[in-house]
């Protein structure tokens, strides 16, 4: 769950930028 949340946050952050 932790790794999934981290990857999701990184993916979303990159998409927003």
Swiss-Prot record:
Membrane topology value: Multi-pass membrane protein
Compartment(s): Plastid, Chloroplast thylakoid membrane
Assigned protein family: Belongs to the ATPase A chain family.
Record protein name field: ATP synthase subunit a, chloroplastic
Function: Key component of the proton channel; it plays a direct role in the translocation of protons across the membrane.
Keywords, alphabetical: ATP synthesis, CF(0), Chloroplast, Hydrogen ion transport, Ion transport, Membrane, Plastid, Thylakoid, Transmembrane, Transport
Ion transport as UniProt keyword: yes
Keyword Transport: yes
Ranges annotated as spanning the membrane: none
Biological processes annotated in GO: ATP biosynthetic process; proton transmembrane transport
Quaternary assembly: F-type ATPases have 2 components, CF(1) - the catalytic core - and CF(0) - the membrane proton channel. CF(1) has five subunits: alpha(3), beta(3), gamma(1), delta(1), epsilon(1). CF(0) has four main subunits: a, b, b' and c.
CC per GO annotation: chloroplast thylakoid membrane; proton-transporting ATP synthase complex
Gene responsible for this protein: atpI
